[in-house]
Each structure stands twice: as structure tokens, then as C-alpha cells.
Curated annotation (Swiss-Prot):
Chain intervals with Basic and acidic residues compositional bias: 1-20
Transmembrane regions: 141-161, 332-352, 361-381, 405-425
Modification comment: Mediates RING-dependent self-ubiquitination leading to proteasomal degradation.
PROSITE patterns (UniProt xref): SAM_DOMAIN (PS50105), ZF_RING_1 (PS00518), ZF_RING_2 (PS50089)
Naturally occurring in which organism (per UniProt): Mus musculus
Gene this chain is encoded by: Bfar
Subcellular location, principal: endoplasmic reticulum
PANTHER family referenced in this protein's UniProt entry, alphabetically: BIFUNCTIONAL APOPTOSIS REGULATOR
Superkingdom of origin organism: Eukaryota
Protein name: Bifunctional apoptosis regulator
């Protein structure tokens, strides 16, 4: 009786040491091998098609192919693949020594570690919701947000269609018509565009039947006495200054966004994208290559010389060609260094009376771009990547310069319709895209905190 008991004990010990072998058919390591590296599965990740691979093998495959499909059957996966916990635990219990050696080798390979980090970051971008929220109904939160974006897109489309159909033809604008061919109504239109105060003198110009030819002959003395009687010296100076510009150019100089776009379609498109993607380089370009026409009016608008100049007319600031003072330069350089998009928002704020909706789109877009820039700086700081800032700056400078050079080279070949589409897209639809980007950054930040 003692010998059978001893045999039973020895068999139980063997079963405890080799549980797989004692259960009938033996299981080999090859049955738990990855079909990419043909080695034991480490952190096995099962795809929708049912195939399982090492997680680092899947990351390397994704990095090299940039495709979200199975390396074996090429079926696309949905969502973001996760580690098969049950299969992982079973393999670690069956082959602990092999798994431990493989994990050590993987951790020592920098390329594999970087691929895993990039793959996980891609997954976080695909699933930005915080884990603590559980499985939130996507139709509840996402549906509301998509509804807001749809409404904003609809407003942008309506505004674009209204503007495109209601505004004058670009060929009919005064910026394209010689002064000596202006009619009485066009002279009055030119006068009213100088500012709200110019409406005081509208009837006087109409009663004298002032057309383009007569306008060119008027002098300061004639403006100061009857029948014009412009007693306000500031008003008279603005009219004379603008009249000198008209005489020098032969046409009306642009005084709003649409007239500037009609006269300078290429420059307006270039400046819009430059100030959107790289405001610091865009303002530097204005300082170096467009100092008198663009930079001086810009700095006098956002950094006025007098503190009580808030009531000053916007067109008066545009005609101010005096050199900025040191106080203006200090204010400008501080904002230029830390909040460049605020400069654009302040400039658009002064144009609210002229461009009601367009200025608001620009202001909102400037705020969103400032928030995205702050998120970028925070990401660099939190990841201790300050050493990469010079390289990032050089890459950004090279990218913007290359795009500007490419546009300058191929500008004559680009159809005007395409340029208009790009212009209106950046003006009205880019803020809607940036709203979505800001929401994603906020959700990603919540995920990292939680």
C-alpha cells in the first residue's frame, strides 16, 4: 500500500512542475510564436482578424508601413489594438525564462522603445477620452460637439456665399479705375470710406457735382472756404493726404481687406497663411520688405502713440507714416516674442466696424492659435525636450521659407479660382478646424493628468 502512495505523490509533483506536459498533448514554444519575429510572443496583441503579434513587432510594422492593417492577412483593424491579457498571462506562466530574456533585449533596443512610444502616442490620439469617464456615449458628447462644428461650418458657408455674391466685382472697384474717370457718386464713395466723419461733407461734394477730374484740381484753400467749408483741420489734413496718394497712384489706394486683396491677390494670400502658420516670421517679412505700406500702419494700429487714441479713426492710423517711438517698439517686441497672435487679434479688433464678421473670425482664430502654441510649449516642457527647441525652430524656418519660395515660383501658374478658395478656406474655415484641435489637446491633457 505504501508504494502506490509514493507513486501518486511523485506524479503529483511532476504535474506541479510540468502542468502542460501532464495534461495530455504537450505544448511547444512554437505554438506561441509571433508571425513577425517567429519568437515567443511578448505582450501579445490580438487584432480584429484574430491574428496575434508581439506588441513591439506590431509597432515596428506600423512605423515602417504607416498602415493600420494586419501584417499577415492585410485586414484593417478598427480602433486601437490592445494587449491580450489572458494570452499574455498564459505565456508568461508557461515560458517565464524566455519571456524575461526577450523583455530585457527589447528594453535595451532604443529603436524598439521609440517605436512603442510612438505607437502608444498614436493610440492616445485615437482615444483621447480619459479612462475615468468609462465608456461615455460617443453620440452624446461627440454628437453635441460635431453639431456645434456643423453649425459653425454652416455660418461660414452662408457668410462666404453672401460675401461672394453681394460684394462688387473686383473689376468695378475704385482701386482699378483711374481717378479722372470717377463719377460724382464714386467721389462721394471715396470720401465716405475715409471714415464716419466724412459723411458730414457728402452733400457739399454732391451739390458741387465734384467728379474725378474736379477732385484732382482741389487745393487746401478751396477745402477751407465755401462751398466745402471743412473747418476741422484734422479732417482737412486727412482728405488732403489721401488725395495726394490718389494723385500719385492714379487710382484709389486700398482701404479695406477686399480692396487690398483685389490689388494684391498673391501678397494677401501669402500674408494670410504666413501670419497664420508663423506670425513671427510673417511680421519680420513685413518689417524687412514692406515697411512703409504695411508694417508702419500695423504697428501704429496695435501700439498707438497716444494712450487716449482709442477714438482715433482707423484710416487716420493707416495714414500715419511716422517712425515708431521706443515705447511703441518695447510694447511691440514684448507681444511679438510671447503673444504674436495677440497682435493680429488687436489689429482685427480695430477693423470691427469695417469688417464685422471677418474680424471676429480672425480674432477667434488668433485666440485658438495662441492656445495651440501654449499646448506645444507645454508638451516640450513636460517631455524635457528643451534641447530640441533650436532644431525645431530651424525646421520650422526651413519649412515656412520653402513653402513661401514654392508659392512665389508657381504663383503665375495657379488659377485665380484656386487662390480664392485657399484664401477663404484659411479665413473662414480654419478657425473651425482649430476648435477641434484645441478640444483634442484638452482631452489629451486630461488623459495624461488622470
Amino acid at each position: 500500500m505504501e508504494e502506490p502512495q509514493k507513486n501518486d505523490l511523485s506524479m503529483r509533483e511532476q504535474e506541479e512542475e510540468h502542468p502542460v506536459r501532464s495534461s495530455g498533448p504537450q505544448i511547444s514554444v512554437s505554438e506561441f510564436s509571433c508571425h513577425c519575429c517567429y519568437d515567443t510572443l511578448v505582450n501579445p496583441t490580438t487584432l480584429n482578424c484574430g491574428h496575434s503579434f508581439c506588441r513591439h513587432c506590431l509597432a515596428l510594422w506600423w512605423m515602417s508601413s504607416k498602415k493600420t492593417e494586419c501584417p499577415e492577412c492585410r485586414e484593417k483593424w478598427e480602433g486601437f489594438p490592445k494587449v491580450n491579457i489572458l494570452l499574455r498571462d498564459a505565456i508568461e506562466k508557461l515560458f517565464p525564462d524566455a519571456i524575461r530574456m526577450r523583455v530585457e533585449d527589447i528594453q535595451q533596443n532604443n529603436d524598439v522603445v521609440q517605436s512603442l512610444a510612438a505607437f502608444q502616442k498614436y493610440g492616445n490620439d485615437q482615444n483621447p477620452l480619459a479612462p475615468s469617464t468609462g465608456r461615455v456615449n460617443p453620440q452624446r458628447g461627440g454628437g453635441f460637439f460635431s453639431g456645434v462644428l456643423t453649425a459653425l461650418t454652416g455660418v461660414a458657408v452662408i457668410l462666404l456665399v453672401y460675401h461672394w455674391r453681394s460684394r462688387e466685382s473686383e473689376h468695378g472697384l475704385l482701386v482699378h479705375k483711374a481717378v479722372d474717370k470717377w463719377t460724382m457718386e464714386e467721389v462721394v464713395l471715396w470720401l465716405e470710406q475715409l471714415g464716419p466723419w466724412a459723411s458730414l461733407y457728402r452733400d457739399r461734394f454732391l451739390s458741387e457735382r465734384v467728379n474725378g477730374r474736379l477732385l484732382l484740381t482741389l487745393t487746401e484753400e478751396e477745402f477751407s472756404r465755401a462751398p466745402y467749408t471743412i473747418e476741422n483741420s484734422s479732417h482737412r489734413r486727412v482728405i488732403l493726404t489721401e488725395l495726394e496718394r490718389v494723385r500719385a497712384l492714379g487710382v484709389k489706394p486700398p482701404q479695406n481687406l477686399w480692396e487690398y486683396k483685389a490689388v494684391n491677390p498673391g501678397r494677401s494670400l501669402f500674408l494670410l497663411y504666413a501670419l497664420k502658420s508663423s506670425p513671427r516670421l510673417g511680421l519680420l517679412y513685413l518689417y524687412l520688405f514692406d515697411y512703409t505700406d504695411c508694417f508702419l500702419p500695423f504697428i501704429h494700429t496695435i501700439c498707438p502713440l497716444q494712450e487716449n487714441s482709442s477714438g482715433e479713426d482707423i484710416f487716420t492710423k493707416l495714414l500715419d507714416l511716422r517712425e515708431p517711438t521706443w515705447k511703441q517698439w518695447r510694447e511691440f517686441l514684448v507681444k511679438y516674442s510671447f503673444l504674436p497672435y495677440q497682435l493680429i487679434a488687436e489689429f482685427a479688433w480695430d477693423w470691427l466696424e469695417v469688417h464685422y464678421w471677418t474680424s471676429r473670425f480672425l480674432i477667434v482664430n488668433a485666440v485658438l492659435l495662441s492656445v495651440l502654441e501654449l499646448f506645444s510649449f507645454w508638451r516640450i516642457w513636460s517631455r524635457s525636450e528643451l534641447k530640441t527647441v533650436p532644431q525645431r525652430m530651424w525646421s520650422h524656418f526651413w519649412k515656412v521659407s520653402t513653402q513661401g519660395l514654392f508659392m512665389a515660383m508657381f504663383w503665375p501658374l495657379i488659377p485665380q479660382f484656386v487662390c480664392n478658395c485657399l484664401f477663404y478656406w484659411a479665413l473662414y474655415f480654419n478657425p473651425i478646424i482649430n476648435i477641434d484641435l484645441v478640444v483634442k489637446e484638452v482631452r489629451r491633457l486630461e488623459t495624461q493628468v488622470l
